[in-house]
């Protein structure tokens, strides 16, 4: 994904991602007069972008960010700014796509997934399959190669990054490993 997306488009990577205040500044976000509202909006934009980039969807509009917001107060806030959050998320993604700002690792993976790559390998081994993003799985499942997923369902640690357990998503024969 890195070689295909970053080099081909001449992108520069932002190693640590963007902080909330940086997103607010880059987008010139405006709140509603409530203290720090623009930073709360920026935080939701950051989360929405991560949600989209890790999803198997092709457009931001295909996702409902509210599905990821569990706190009742946050839901009320997001509902009142939803269209603005979506528009600003799309603008931020556009800025990365045009090379106006550095891209994130999530972004180049998404760019790779959206390119529908064909990987010319006979076998593809997907390690740590319990922590796969839907974007990764979309690429993996579309390949013609013999596919193998290795993982441990009891070691899933990236759910907060929208990872899913690919071991449950694949209709593959399961083999138990032992020592």
Predicted segment positions?
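Short, intrinsically disordered, charge-balanced linker/junction segments flanking boundaries
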Residues: 1, 26, 51, 61-63, ...
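Conserved helicase motor core of SF1/SF2 NTP-dependent helicases
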Residues: 1, 118-119, 123, 130-179
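Conserved P-loop NTPase-based nucleic-acid remodeling module centered on helicase motor cores
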Residues: 1-49
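Short helix-capping/linker segments at secondary-structure and domain boundaries
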Residues: 11-12, 55-60, 116-119
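An accessory alpha-helical subdomain
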Residues: 30-80
